[in-house]
Amino acid sequence: MITRHAIFVGRVKAGQEAAMRAYVKAELEPLWRQFACAKEVKVSYGVEQDPNGPQIPLMLAITYEDETGMAAALDSPARYTSRDLLPGFYDRFFEDVTLLHYVME
């Protein structure tokens, strides 16, 4: 099994934390759950941050059986749809944001 993590590093606009979570739950998470070959989808929200580290308000972890399954997910229509929503998501809810991806066993 491998897990692909999407880590949203940045600052949510003041007062937009609840709205950001609601948007993720209503718009992005249903798409992420449609990724081909996904075995488990976990969405996590930052609650407590290391004072010396970067702000991470949102993390996504999707687990696949293997790299072939992950490749199918990255080429699935739901992935492209969710990716196309990200610029508007960033503009609406973030002061600044960088999206990082890591694949872990």
Located regions from the model:
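Active-site-adjacent beta-strand/loop module that shapes the phosphate/pyrophosphate-binding cleft
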Residues: M59, T63-E65
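Short amphipathic alpha-helical segments
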Residues: Q16-V43, A78-F89
